[in-house]
């Protein structure tokens, strides 16, 4: 594989590349510098784990074999009311570019950590909006060819997309937005960020919401608090005292600590109200 296309690191600790600050070494950590480099890396390592910004990942303490990181694939440009981005671009930077160009539609996503690719993979959402609301098309690599799919082909639903049942790699995507007043966009974004800061442990290492919401009127954090688990700690992993839907790393948490907390929460919630919680965080 051409090193001009990719940077390659050996035995790279994944804790340096995940928002949880957890994870053992990747035997090979491959960082493509272009879409062509990404396709080249995928052709050499078709079974590699794909890592964007690492904000929704719990990596194992034992590490993994090969990781391909999209962090350097962050080009982004505006074409009238479309924003076209490579898959590694941060959602934060895309929201900022939208506001700077007076484009509305991504306000809900301001403050969601992670990459464009990860957001589409999970159909990320918050505050009444979802990524599927604004996706126009996605360019993907299926292991043999590059193809462009429009929104109707992506099988979006709550925290789901077609990419969770395929090995297709998201290369780039376009978001269809609308012209609006820049000040109104910025005000909406800042209001959402303030709400995040007030309600979520954004100053602590975590992977965001651990569990999917099982129903419109079911609030996971509230139930966890009701059954007395808020603040529960295993090793250096703790159910956040600020928002019980989050597990935070107090310093030296291990993946095994987090998994034990997840098991406790799921068991107690099932016992309390009969609901089997589904994970939103992705466990490698």
UniProtKB/Swiss-Prot annotation:
The active site is at 159, 209 (proton donor), 280. Residues 21-180 form the FAD-binding PCMH-type domain. Its EC number is 1.3.1.98. It catalyses: UDP-N-acetyl-alpha-D-muramate + NADP(+) = UDP-N-acetyl-3-O-(1-carboxyvinyl)-alpha-D-glucosamine + NADPH + H(+). It is an enzyme of class 1 (oxidoreductase). Disulfide bonds: none annotated. GO terms for molecular function: FAD binding; UDP-N-acetylmuramate dehydrogenase activity. GO terms for biological process: cell division; cell wall organization; peptidoglycan biosynthetic process; regulation of cell shape. InterPro entries: FAD-bd_PCMH, FAD-bd_PCMH-like_sf, FAD-bd_PCMH_sub1, FAD-bd_PCMH_sub2, MurB, MurB_C, MurB_C_sf, Oxid_FAD_bind_N. Keywords: Cell cycle, Cell division, Cell shape, Cell wall biogenesis/degradation, Cytoplasm, FAD, Flavoprotein, NADP, Oxidoreductase, Peptidoglycan synthesis. Pathway: Cell wall biogenesis; peptidoglycan biosynthesis. Pfam families: FAD_binding_4, MurB_C. Its cofactor is FAD. GO terms for cellular component: cytosol. It is found in: Cytoplasm. HAMAP family: MurB. Cell wall formation. Belongs to the MurB family. This is UDP-N-acetylenolpyruvoylglucosamine reductase. It comes from Pseudothermotoga lettingae (strain ATCC BAA-301 / DSM 14385 / NBRC 107922 / TMO).
């Amino acid at each position: 594989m051409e090193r001009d296309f990719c940077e390659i690191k050996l035995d790279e600790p994944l804790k340096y590349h995940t928002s949880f600050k957890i994870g053992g070494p990747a035997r090979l950590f491959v960082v493509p510098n272009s879409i062509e480099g990404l396709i080249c890396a995928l052709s050499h390592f078709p079974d590699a784990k794909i890592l964007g910004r690492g904000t929704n990942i719990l990596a194992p303490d034992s590490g993994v074999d090969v990781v391909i990181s999209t962090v350097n694939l962050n080009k982004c440009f505006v074409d009238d009311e479309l924003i076209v981005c490579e898959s590694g671009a941060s959602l934060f930077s895309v929201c900022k570019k939208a506001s700077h160009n007076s484009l509305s539609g991504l306000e809900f996503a301001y403050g969601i950590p992670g990459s464009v690719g990860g957001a589409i993979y999970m159909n990320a959402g918050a505050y009444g909006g979802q990524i599927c609301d604004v996706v126009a098309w996605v360019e993907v690599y299926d292991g043999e060819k590059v193809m462009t799919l429009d929104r109707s082909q992506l099988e979006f639903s709550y925290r789901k997309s077609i990419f969770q049942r395929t090995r297709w790699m998201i290369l780039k995507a376009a978001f269809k937005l609308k012209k609006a007043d820049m000040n109104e966009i910025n005000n909406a974004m800042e209001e959402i960020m303030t709400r995040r800061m007030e309600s979520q442990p954004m100053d602590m290492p975590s992977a965001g919401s651990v569990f999917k919401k099982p129903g419109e009127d079911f609030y996971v954090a509230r139930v966890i608090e009701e059954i007395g688990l808020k603040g529960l700690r295993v090793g250096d992993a703790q159910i956040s005292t600020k928002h019980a839907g989050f597990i935070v790393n107090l310093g030296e948490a291990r993946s095994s600590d987090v998994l034990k907390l997840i098991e406790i929460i799921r068991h107690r919630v099932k016992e309390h109200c009969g609901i089997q919680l589904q994970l939103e965080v992705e466990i490698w």
